[in-house]
Amino acid sequence: MAHEAMEYDVQVQLNHAEQQPAPAGMASSQGGPALLQPVPADVVSSQGVPSILQPAPAEVISSQATPPLLQPAPQLSVDLTEVEVLGEDTVENINPRTSEQHRQGSDGNHTIPASSLHSMTNFISGLQRLHGMLEFLRPSSSNHSVGPMRTRRRVSASRRARAGGSQRTDSARLRAPLDAYFQVSRTQPDLPATTYDSETRNPVSEELQVSSSSDSDSDSSAEYGGVVDQAEESGAVILEEQLAGVSAEQEVTCIDGGKTLPKQPSPQKSEPLLPSASMDEEEGDTCTICLEQWTNAGDHRLSALRCGHLFGYRCISTWLKGQVRKCPQCNKKARHSDIVVLYARTLRALDTSEQERMKSSLLKEQMLRKQAELESAQCRLQLQVLTDKCTRLQRRVQDLQKLTSHQSQNLQQPRGSQAWVLSCSPSSQGQHKHKYHFQKTFTVSQAGNCRIMAYCDALSCLVISQPSPQASFLPGFGVKMLSTANMKSSQYIPMHGKQIRGLAFSSYLRGLLLSASLDNTIKLTSLETNTVVQTYNAGRPVWSCCWCLDEANYIYAGLANGSILVYDVRNTSSHVQELVAQKARCPLVSLSYMPRAASAAFPYGGVLAGTLEDASFWEQKMDFSHWPHVLPLEPGGCIDFQTENSSRHCLVTYRPDKNHTTIRSVLMEMSYRLDDTGNPICSCQPVHTFFGGPTCKLLTKNAIFQSPENDGNILVCTGDEAANSALLWDAASGSLLQDLQTDQPVLDICPFEVNRNSYLATLTEKMVHIYKWE
């Protein structure tokens, strides 16, 4: 009857709690929702029946704006259910006297009647309705969740709690038969101290677990377990905090007098994400010998061999101590001393296969691009060579056509008839309307020692050899540039260590000057950059030089022993041919190149070389070989040898001898005849002789050139050392046209043309005299 009365009171209290509205005092002063709290222990009825849960008084609500929590009910004398929170501290019973009395009463009843079970079911239903009311009053937490949450039913935990109820110790049986309490575990972020409203409330986890404390038999336990499962499935949803969640936990415990003390929330800590299990199973983290993961400490720590493969230290050490002392992966020889311990926590290979593939593609593309550029350059070079060759062949065809048209006339006329024609031409018999008039004088070197001149038509400048103007600071010899456009001299360009004996400009390469010196070298100097671009060492003093007019890349250098060295400007090391002197080994005082097929009377091309004793014509063959022809000149006394390419004439100068008391300049016409085998024999025939002064101490260079009148006549200019003048002759008539006076003996003569005006320059040791044809 006592049990039935107790059950009836419980049911009445439950119904009363459902119908009674919450008092207005429950509202929080901060605006937060008031939570239900169990009544204190002194409200329990005299029959020992609890009054179930009543609204908590207003003073229980935290004044620091912390959300009010559900407080556990005090210890009652009804052995109904046991509510626990797994993983948290157990709320101890503060009133052992009531529990002891109920324990003694409950020891006598080991079986629960059907009415008691029905009362328990009603009681649990009331708890579920209270839980629904709490959920209705609780604000939505979907927008205030701190971290990822998950729900988990703790059915197994409640069953373990029921199973352990029958095995309690004696100290556990001293507890109250009705050991029911609530513990709401919430984790919340730190709240501001200003206000508290429904938005700041952020519950994270809440557990409500009902367990049985009865010592009944197995049937009652099973029946009671079903009731608990039904209660949990209907409303007791447990929220737990996951590993990545950052939260703080509040615990509420029950003490004497019904007061509650909330535990302060622990500081929030961010825990790093644990590595996934799949990373531990990767092949790169396991030893290939034992197929287990290596460690960063201990006897199985990460180690490597000289070949680079990774193993555990214990495994590879045991492996190498055996008979097979090779790497388990690549079979390379290894020793125990080759083991190297790697101090690394983890290893992870970066996938660079795509990057390496792109690099290889880039290298391949660059290689193909370079190959294409090289092929393009080769094609351009071949095109240039073929274009030059085609131009030369076209020019030769034109010359051969002229030769064919005049062949009959040349066969009918005797040798020397052309000289008679020149002397009898009407233009040569009449007086010249124009003369050379003195224009200007330039001082080249105060110290003297100037020797030779050359004119560059592409740059419109005249270069004169001279010693260095600052011999103490920069000794040697060079050239001074004289602009013919404004008739002003410019800078000095140093070139050689000794006196310069020959200067010549290329007809194909712009501004490239060839110079020969007594310092055993020939040099190529660019006047566009004023720098020496190539130097050749001839081994002997070089007296003269010239360019090949049929092949733009070949040059000739006349040595002191009478030999001629042939150089290819594309070969920077040494000469490609050497033409040995045929007779006397005397210095080559002059070299002049006569291009092939320049005239129908003499179609062959080659270099004319004049020494102090004789002269030779080196015929150039198609394979760039040279065949010598000794010219029939007077023996001894030759000091200069000049050519005129258009008319195929040459001018040979002799010094005075016992048979001739003055300087003689003989105009020669180049000729040829065929021998029995059909090979040509080159020779020359005298046309006119021009006489000068009786003195010849200097090797004066004379000039033979076309008349500025462009009438086909040829002019000859010779130097006269005795009179300090330059004599201008008409080659057709042999008559003297002008006597150009200077202050010193003339050393070199150079005609040139600028802006359709013809000029003549004469060089002495210190000065240059400019004359204009007017």
UniProtKB/Swiss-Prot annotation:
WD repeats lie at residues 495-537, 539-577, 583-628. InterPro entries: RFWD3 (IPR037381), WD40/YVTN_repeat-like_dom_sf (IPR015943), WD40_repeat_dom_sf (IPR036322), WD40_RFWD3 (IPR056527), WD40_rpt (IPR001680), Znf_RING (IPR001841), Znf_RING/FYVE/PHD (IPR013083). It catalyses: S-ubiquitinyl-[E2 ubiquitin-conjugating enzyme]-L-cysteine + [acceptor protein]-L-lysine = [E2 ubiquitin-conjugating enzyme]-L-cysteine + N(6)-ubiquitinyl-[acceptor protein]-L-lysine. It holds the Pfam family WD40_RFWD3. Residues 106-116 have a biased composition (Polar residues). One of its GO terms (molecular function) is p53 binding. Residues 95-116, 139-225, 257-280 are annotated as: Disordered. Changing residue 639 to K: In FANCW; abolishes interaction with the RPA complex and subsequent recruitment of the protein at DNA damage sites; decreased function in double-strand break repair via homologous recombination. The coiled coil domain may be involved in RPA2-binding. This is E3 ubiquitin-protein ligase RFWD3. It comes from Homo sapiens. The gene is RFWD3.
